Amino acid sequence: MKLPREIRDQICIYAVLSPTTAPDTTQSFEELTESRVNFKNPNLRAWCSLVLYSPNPPTSTVTSLLLVNKQLHSETRSNLELLAKSPYCSLDLIILDEIVLLPTWTTIPVPDTTTLNTVDVTFRIAGVHQKKKEYPYGPYKGFQIGDGAGPAMQWQIYAVLERFIRAGFSGETECRNTHKHITAKRINIDIQTPPDVSPERFGRPANGYPRRRRKEEPKTVLDPDYLAGFVRGNLGGLMVGLNYEWFNYGQILYEHLDEIVLCKDGVEIERWDVAERLKNVVPESHLSREKLAEYKEEAWALRRARGLKVLDN
């Protein structure tokens, strides 16, 4: 505590922003999933919510710093107030064996905030598809196609976003109807190429065709370019409003986000201005001009109240 206050503040902020270690993807399927659970609350709209979370609340260095002594408690509080002006968090998201998603919060500087400036999401691909791993998770998961529902993975990714907006960092609530309305100025999504995998091993999802018989298990690894296109198509579809269903599920984006940026290995692929997308949604056969105008008026009011970008129609 004899260091100058400026240096102590730098050390404190460094400690608060230092990420926790993300799971090691060289572990086996069983090692990565054995301690994880599929949360029940809140009630999600996603058709498939097969996402396995750690049952323990996300950890943060903030709590330990606050408990050291009165002086450090006070200084940490002051630094948290500064960080709260531009709150940031980061999420590690593993797609394991093309079947399940494993989210892990690695940075949570301000755990109790509901208004975030930036959310960094890193997609990592782990393992190869093995049919025997599918059985505990039911018939609809991963890239398998559902009757009229598209690949389950689009809903699993949607469920991660929906649960975050509704439940925050903990991912779970006591009540089914809880909605914390977490907002973010920007979500940065970076899809990373698995290290130490030769390009010729990359391929399309091996579990996307459940009725096709195979004599042996595939040896391919999910292609990060395919995954980037998959995420791009599904996120873009939610904000285009091509039909009532897409528009209906896209409302959670319209009401809680300003911008989504999609990258692969740090290189930008697509950038969506959510307010601009909302402005440009047009009526279609299942949504009258009057109903759309009514919704937009409500959505703009919500965005204004939540400090998000608002445009003139």
Task: Label each region the model flagged.
Residues 309-313:
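A positional/structural detector of protein chain ends, strongest at the extreme C-terminus
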Residues 9, 52-297, 307:
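C-terminal-biased hydrophobic
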Residues 1-35, 39-52, 63-64, 71:
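N-terminal Skp1-binding subsegment of the F-box domain
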